[in-house]
Each structure stands twice: as C-alpha cells, then as structure tokens.
Amino acid sequence: SLATEKDKNGHQLNFFTGNFDFSDDKQKAILIGFQQQDESLYRNTFLGNISPITGGFITENSAAYIYTGIEWNVDLGGMIFTPSFAPGLYHEGDGKDLGHVLEFKSEVQLSYETSEKSSFGVSYNHVSNASLGNKNPGANSYMFNFLKTF
C-alpha cells in the first residue's frame, strides 16, 4: 500500500494543475503547483497517518500561494483519501484579492496507485482568510495530481 511504501522511502512530490477559483467566472484562472510531503516525520495517531506538507502554486494571473501544514493519508485499498490543512501566504498579483496575506487552505484529495511509487489523483480545496481581513471572498479550486514517491 502507499502508506507502507512511503514509510520506507522518505518523501513524496505532488505535481498538480487545475482551475483556481473555478466558481467565480470573473476570477477563475489556471494554476500549477507542487507539494512535498516528508513521510520520515509522520505520526500515527487515532486519526491515522499524519505528516507535514509544504508547497505552493501560481496562477496564470500571477497570484501565488505558499504554505506549510499537515495531511492525513487514509488507505482505502488502492485508493488513498488525503484531507489536509495548511496556513500560508498569498500574493494576489493580477488575480483575485482574497482580503489578507494570511490564508488557510483546506483540501481533500483522492488518488489511485498506478504503480508502487506513482499515483494519479484529483483534489478540491478552499482558500480563505477566516475573516482576518475586511473581506473574505475565499477561492474554490480543483486540481489533477501526479504523485511520485522517492
């Protein structure tokens, strides 16, 4: 399984592309990004396997987000369900004004193991400032993911 595989190999890179803020016709934009997960720092808890993540993305409108947080890996027998939470720093560039530099990303991902060290997945996230700013429009995004374990 992927969870056992990652225990032995150390870390995983997730390369993704998708549609940033797809629910806002005026602000939606193509995004590309990456995420690194260090399995050597994982913790088995009553919630499952939790490990740290760090990553970022940029949109076609030069908006950028860098983050660090945690993810849970739930092995569903060939499929992996991965919810995550990550605070980060957002720069709007020519893209959407999310109301604050500090934003929080909540995400769910479902991936399928295509080989011992590779998976493909789909994910959905919501980025929001939790009302820290004067406005909090948020952004909903979906992505297609390629995950490689090293």
Where do the protein language model's features map onto the residues?
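Short loop/turn motifs that connect adjacent beta-strands in outer-membrane beta-barrel proteins
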Residues: 2-10, 24-25, 40-50, 75-81, ...
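Solvent-exposed loop/turn segments connecting transmembrane beta-strands
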Residues: 20-30, 56-67, 94-101, 131-138
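Outer-membrane beta-barrel "beta-signal"
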Residues: 28-34, 137-150
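Residue-level signature of outer-membrane beta-barrel architecture
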Residues: 36-38, 72-74, 112, 126, ...
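Mid-chain, well-packed structural core segment of small domains
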Residues: 79-106
